[in-house]
Amino acid sequence: MHASLASYAAAAMPALDLRPEIAHAHQPVMSPSHHGWDGNGATAVPTPMPKRLDGKVAIVTGGARGIGEAIVRLFAKHGARVVIADIDDAAGEALASALGPQVSFVRCDVSVEDDVRRAVDWALSRHGGRLDVYCNNAGVLGRQTRAARSILSFDAAEFDRVLRVNALGAALGMKHAARAMAPRRAGSIVSVASVAAVLGGLGPHAYTASKHAIVGLTKNAACELRAHGVRVNCVSPFGVATPMLINAWRQGHDDATADADRDLDLDLDVTVPSDQEVEKMEEVVRGLATLKGPTLRPRDIAEAVLFLASDEARYISGHNLVVDGGVTTSRNLIGL
């Protein structure tokens, strides 16, 4: 197994879901305990579970595709009115249209404070001055040439760009979400970080620094906002096979043909990989995983975000929920 391929697979935040396991937003949520036998020898009739975000208002940045799309769909399925905040107009509007009137789209570049402010204000005006959940999901990986990956030769402008999107974007989201939530003395802010914020050597320097920043911001903001009844948490996922990840690996291992000026971070720029490439990357991820059996998919990360966003986590704040099958616990990443 190639060490660099393994590093990308372990740490990179995915941009697109190639094989979605995402239920439609309007599909009823069924209780697993009500499937099969009812204990009296008869087959029980499935009954809907309570929707965990029923009536709540949520903003999901980077919600047009990938993990963000999985979060949007799951939030809507659980009764939330969801605002997709993304730079991909076509994908965002298409997703909102597909999910119905409870989901809407607003264009938002999270590295621009005016955009973040407008997105929050737009959600408040649309939903009666209410914002219950803000999910900082938008992020970029950064350029993946050999020079860009080295501490000896990285480009300062590119480093700054990645931190502006990933770290500043999360901070601005927390700032304006808290502005809306604090007066109501309630709310949940959930950010998507990475296992690269837990173990060193798993990702590019700018990306790793930005994800550490998200964990630090989460803890600091949780300390400040607890007095206002606002919870702040983050989720750090393991690798998921996505076009962004696969394209980054291609660029990083073909410096002879790589265009150092090409952005491979944004969903709009990636080339959809073949099924064989997806299977290869998923094989790499499964090989690195210490929990054998399931393959981590965007839906798994969305479920973790849903938990932290919901009242089921009402006394959890300042926490980094690592979704990695125990990799960072055992630190058993052979080949990295």
UniProtKB/Swiss-Prot annotation:
Q: Short name of one Pfam family for this protein?
A: adh_short_C2
The keyword DNA-binding belongs to this UniProt entry's keyword annotation:
no
Keyword Oxidoreductase found: yes
Q: Which domain of life is it from?
A: Eukaryota
Database matches in SUPFAM superfamilies: NAD(P)-binding Rossmann-fold domains (SSF51735)
Keywords assigned by UniProt, alphabetized: Developmental protein, Oxidoreductase
Family listed: Belongs to the short-chain dehydrogenases/reductases (SDR) family.
Q: What does this protein do?
A: Required for stage-specific floral organ abortion.
Active-site residues per Swiss-Prot or TrEMBL entry: 207 (proton acceptor)
Protein name as it appears in the record: Sex determination protein tasselseed-2
InterPro entries in UniProt: ABA2-like (IPR045309), NAD(P)-bd_dom_sf (IPR036291), SDR_fam (IPR002347)
Q: Which residues bind NAD(+)?
A: 59-83
- Show the GO MF annotations: oxidoreductase activity, acting on the CH-OH group of donors, NAD or NADP as acceptor
User: Per UniProt, where does substrate bind?
Assistant: 194
